[in-house]
Amino acid sequence: MISAVFGKRRSLSRTLTAGTICAALISGYATMASADDGQGATGEAIIHADDHPGNWMTYGRTYSDQRYSPLDQINRSNVGNLKLAWYLDLDTNRGQEGTPLVIDGVMYATTNWSMMKAVDAATGKLLWSYDPRVPGNIADKGCCDTVNRGAAYWNGKVYFGTFDGRLIALDAKTGKLVWSVNTIPPEAELGKQRSYTVDGAPRIAKGRVIIGNGGSEFGARGFVSAFDAETGKVDWRFFTVPNPKNEPDAASDSVLMNKAYQTWSPTGAWTRQGGGGTVWDSIVYDPVADLVYLGVGNGSPWNYKYRSEGKGDNLFLGSIVALKPETGEYVWHFQETPMDQWDFTSDQQIMTLDLPINGETRHVIVHARKNGFFYIIDAKTGEFISGKNYVYVNWASGLDPKTGRPIYNPDALYTLTGKEWYGIPGDLGGHNFAAMAFSPKTGLVYIPAQQVPFLYTNQVGGFTPHPDSWNLGLDMNKVGIPDSPEAKQAFVKDLKGWIVAWDPQKQAEAWRVDHKGPWNGGILATGGDLLFQGLANGEFHAYDATNGSDLFHFAADSGIIAPPVTYLANGKQYVAVEVGWGGIYPFFLGGLARTSGWTVNHSRIIAFSLDGKSGPLPKQNDQGFLPVKPPAQFDSKRTDNGYFQFQTYCAACHGDNAEGAGVLPDLRWSGSIRHEDAFYNVVGRGALTAYGMDRLHGNMNPTEIEDIRQFLIKRANETYQREVDARKNADGIPEQLP
């Protein structure tokens, strides 16, 4: 009990005894201000999470991942009185995607670069902080920012993954290291290519910590691992795609060798690139079915013809796979996108519900996945029940009502036709990692939906991989939007974002809330008939859960992509969210991503209550990277190759066609482009490796790096006056740049 800070609220009971502690020699350190003793949640406590509604004990609050809290002190009648209670500035102004946990008044929040913080949930006072010291050169091994989506809590320990592939257990009271393991075994690496990263939240099931990874864009063979929560010893590992030689190597051996291998070509590029199928987000334990569900990712490479010679369904890409938590043994699977060639992962949030269907209540999985369809699947057997598109789709006309298999639009099979395909949804999906929520009071699922088209174009001349780069099998010179006002205006008209309130019983939309653009935050539903969501334009909103009416908004000054949580501290209800825009949408879409609303990142955690007394957030820079007049001369004979090299190695972080969205440096205005040696010192020699800009000397020669510099000077000259003019409005903030 920690009465000094948390009053007389009853703590969770500790139902498991501490096991063996395994020390690990790993870099990292904790700094501690002061900490009080929160007690340990266990699986039994999480199963009965509603007995402790003031806590947020696991990623989705309960094992069902519904992100619904019964707390109702804050409700429709008084939410307009909500005020900022406290804020805590974070270490880095990059994207923040984490779901904080709150156990007995202590908040455990993971932040960018895999840092962990324990915070007094009533005051925002930092109790301790742990930095695992992720090497800066790991940043370019991941597709979509060095984010972290959250932690797990078990028996007095807090667990989280690091971007360089570790799983760390800390003492929740002190922040001291208990154990640390490398989750990426040597046999998972592809020769010298190590592209695995970890940014998802681990999950706890029956005393095991389960974690996946990402990396399919570079070349990876997906898997999940389960570790003993007390010791860190690996219990089992399940690969999601076969061994290319069809040899045994994990708990997945039997099903991969007997069921999955024949769905792949024996000689496609997957045998060298790993095949993909990384489980980078959704892992759910269901105590009702006693199963662990995995959301399996896209292929590596994306291009189906190159990956598997255009043959087979490629199990278990784009699938939900159910395993036994004790052993990792396969139980069932349902493949949502056979023959994936659009980056239609199944990693999006898996939620379980008890749903009335044809006169009986069935325990089901509901899944609003990237491909634009809302699936209802029997949670115990994997039987397809129904599916309906929740956003506009043009790649399929629907799903087979018996099997759930997509009814493909033949033109969408671009890898087989050899023609370009303007896909909706595009690779970012109708729903991505941003959490959806369910309210048992309304019976609705609330989806942070979006529309971001993508031009799919085959890589010419066959598949040619590039080390430490995206290897999609696409022509990266053509997937970008041309730099013309007409082309950009046409594309911008197709960029959309909404809350879609979906009735799962009717498989129909109930209503929607329109947003300025895509890439908004996750959603929280509460017993006060409220929905909370942060937006890309820096606003934090509360909506009426029955009809979507906007009841409250707050200027957070930075874009929000994280999902909110709610909890009790000293008997008072709070709502909190991590602030900081990032991820692949602003990274790659660059200037076009500003259509969702321009903000400059000032990453922090903010918390609200009905009697908050923090006052407004401090005024900070809101103009971002200012344009600097570039050198006037460039070599036009080198800029075409510079564009190719930039799109291959640089665009995923610094923006399509070298236009940044303000999260990472906009290279058009970098002082280094003025001097050949200065630019090579950064790009070739790695002068800024500690900050996440790894050296590319091993992948490009000095001539190719200089070609990039010439291209950047060209782009700076083409866009300088446009950017200057955009900052001449009353607020000095860039408007949309068509």
Curated annotation (Swiss-Prot):
<dbReference type="InterPro" id="IPR011047">
    <property type="entry name" value="Quinoprotein_ADH-like_sf"/>
</dbReference>
<feature type="binding site" description="covalent">
    <location>
        <position position="653"/>
    </location>
    <ligand>
        <name>heme c</name>
    </ligand>
</feature>
<dbReference type="GO" id="GO:0005886">
    <property type="term" value="C:plasma membrane"/>
</dbReference>
<feature type="binding site">
    <location>
        <position position="298"/>
    </location>
    <ligand>
        <name>Ca(2+)</name>
    </ligand>
</feature>
<feature type="binding site">
    <location>
        <position position="278"/>
    </location>
    <ligand>
        <name>pyrroloquinoline quinone</name>
    </ligand>
</feature>
<dbReference type="InterPro" id="IPR001479">
    <property type="entry name" value="Quinoprotein_DH_CS"/>
</dbReference>
<keyword id="KW-0560">Oxidoreductase</keyword>
<keyword id="KW-0479">Metal-binding</keyword>
<feature type="binding site" description="axial binding residue">
    <location>
        <position position="693"/>
    </location>
    <ligand>
        <name>heme c</name>
    </ligand>
</feature>
<comment type="function">
    <text>Dehydrogenase component of the alcohol dehydrogenase multicomponent enzyme system which is involved in the production of acetic acid and in the ethanol oxidase respiratory chain. Quinohemoprotein alcohol dehydrogenase (ADH) catalyzes the oxidation of ethanol to acetaldehyde by transferring electrons to the ubiquinone embedded in the membrane phospholipids. The electrons transfer from ethanol to membranous ubiquinone occurs from pyrroloquinoline quinone (PQQ) to one heme c in subunit I (AdhA), and finally to two heme c in subunit II (AdhB).</text>
</comment>
<dbReference type="GO" id="GO:0005509">
    <property type="term" value="F:calcium ion binding"/>
</dbReference>
<keyword id="KW-0106">Calcium</keyword>
<comment type="subunit">
    <text>The alcohol dehydrogenase multicomponent enzyme system is composed of a dehydrogenase subunit I (AdhA) and a cytochrome c subunit II (AdhB).</text>
</comment>
<feature type="binding site">
    <location>
        <position position="149"/>
    </location>
    <ligand>
        <name>pyrroloquinoline quinone</name>
    </ligand>
</feature>
<comment type="similarity">
    <text>Belongs to the bacterial PQQ dehydrogenase family.</text>
</comment>
<keyword id="KW-0634">PQQ</keyword>
<keyword id="KW-0679">Respiratory chain</keyword>
<feature type="disulfide bond">
    <location>
        <begin position="143"/>
        <end position="144"/>
    </location>
</feature>
<feature type="signal peptide">
    <location>
        <begin position="1"/>
        <end position="35"/>
    </location>
</feature>
<dbReference type="GO" id="GO:0009055">
    <property type="term" value="F:electron transfer activity"/>
</dbReference>
<keyword id="KW-0813">Transport</keyword>
<feature type="active site" description="Proton acceptor">
    <location>
        <position position="343"/>
    </location>
</feature>
<dbReference type="GO" id="GO:0020037">
    <property type="term" value="F:heme binding"/>
</dbReference>
<keyword id="KW-0249">Electron transport</keyword>
<dbReference type="InterPro" id="IPR036909">
    <property type="entry name" value="Cyt_c-like_dom_sf"/>
</dbReference>
<feature type="domain" description="Cytochrome c">
    <location>
        <begin position="634"/>
        <end position="738"/>
    </location>
</feature>
<keyword id="KW-1003">Cell membrane</keyword>
<keyword id="KW-0349">Heme</keyword>
<dbReference type="GO" id="GO:0030288">
    <property type="term" value="C:outer membrane-bounded periplasmic space"/>
</dbReference>
<keyword id="KW-0472">Membrane</keyword>
<keyword id="KW-1015">Disulfide bond</keyword>
<protein>
    <recommendedName>
        <fullName>Alcohol dehydrogenase (quinone), dehydrogenase subunit</fullName>
        <ecNumber>1.1.5.5</ecNumber>
    </recommendedName>
</protein>
<feature type="binding site">
    <location>
        <position position="217"/>
    </location>
    <ligand>
        <name>Ca(2+)</name>
    </ligand>
</feature>
<keyword id="KW-0408">Iron</keyword>
<dbReference type="InterPro" id="IPR009056">
    <property type="entry name" value="Cyt_c-like_dom"/>
</dbReference>
<feature type="binding site">
    <location>
        <position position="343"/>
    </location>
    <ligand>
        <name>Ca(2+)</name>
    </ligand>
</feature>
<dbReference type="InterPro" id="IPR017512">
    <property type="entry name" value="PQQ_MeOH/EtOH_DH"/>
</dbReference>
<feature type="binding site">
    <location>
        <position position="97"/>
    </location>
    <ligand>
        <name>pyrroloquinoline quinone</name>
    </ligand>
</feature>
<feature type="binding site" description="axial binding residue">
    <location>
        <position position="654"/>
    </location>
    <ligand>
        <name>heme c</name>
    </ligand>
</feature>
<dbReference type="InterPro" id="IPR018391">
    <property type="entry name" value="PQQ_b-propeller_rpt"/>
</dbReference>
<feature type="binding site">
    <location>
        <position position="584"/>
    </location>
    <ligand>
        <name>pyrroloquinoline quinone</name>
    </ligand>
</feature>
<dbReference type="Pfam" id="PF13360">
    <property type="entry name" value="PQQ_2"/>
</dbReference>
